[in-house]
Amino acid sequence: MDPQAQFCHNPECPARGQLGRRNIRVHSRKERRYRCITCGRTFAATHDTPFYRLKKPTELVLIVLTLLCHGCPLQAIVAAFGLDERTIAAWRTRAGRHGQQFHEHHVLGGQVQLGHVQADELYVKAVVRRFWMAMAMAVPSRLWLGGVVSARRDLSLITTLVQMVRRAAKSMAFLVCVDGLASYVTAFARVFRDPVHTGKAGRPRLAAIPGLLLGQLIKHHRGRYLVEVTRRVVLGTAEAITAVLAATGTGTGINTSYIERLNATFRSALNPLVRRGRAIVHGEGVLTGWMYLVGCAYNFCWNHDSLRVAAPPGERLKWRDQTPAMAAGLTDHQWTMGELLSCPIPLPPWVAPKRRRRLPKRFQDPQPVPTSARFPVVLPLKESLKAFSLDREIGLSSQKSMASFG
């Protein structure tokens, strides 16, 4: 147990989610619990991970989730390990939720040099309906940038995907290659623009971000056969697009071959995506979590053959393998499934709550009584009461005298 690698999970703690503050101590090695000396709360070592409060051995859960990431049918896992389908589904849901948080924290942090991005969508068969799953990738590093699942292939689906691409981008100057879907042009034009502040009243005008290149590969079919391919330059020039393709080594013309190859990887890893298969997905949330689980394993745990580099002289092996996350500079080693699923996601920094009302009078500081030229001196309380009673007596006596005179 390493307390220096842990952080406080208490949402009300001022030191929540912060590493290196030396506020974590070992509370119980037998129960694997830590304690925060800032707030005094204890928490388990598996808190905020898929293994939290599970009764089954961690090794068994890792094996089952690894098989699910490699396209193993659910019924095969049930027959091999004697588990219930609902148990496996619950583990998959936990791991998918953790994978989505992990992806948003490590990939969508604006640290990736994209260079060349490709996006595409594919349909998934479900119970009584089908879903559309749109995904994007950074071609030079083969990094999966994220995906969105929706029942409709519309502008909302593509806009959400494009927003994820912008969150991951470190520089806004890169090339985007997509298919002929018109929603891509509208989504990239809306998302990749910034307000131009002129100092005048009113909402500032939104201007397109310079440096973004967009090309479309439009395929014309006749029946089930591809008869013609049209390459269209939407943003930028053909010379600029060719220069980016040559610099990144990702082709000589506008293409979507890399994202289509990634689609094939996901089809082999997600059982419901197999063509002409019998497996179907039961809900949009299940597919989203499963997609993020496979995507995180692809980025951080799986070596990519096209990313290997020559090993330094003197090493036993000729090549050094890399994962997409290593090629993108997000990590320096290949993660295991245990590391991926055991990595908790830190909470955002604690912010002191704002007081929305005045303090009670017993907690307020006494305020000085303001003086004026007409009343320069404020009498003490007793003197004020005496003066008030004297003025009242004078007023009553004058009223009596006036009544007697009348």
Locate the predicted segments by residue.
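Residue-level recognition of single "structural anchor" positions
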Residues: 1-406
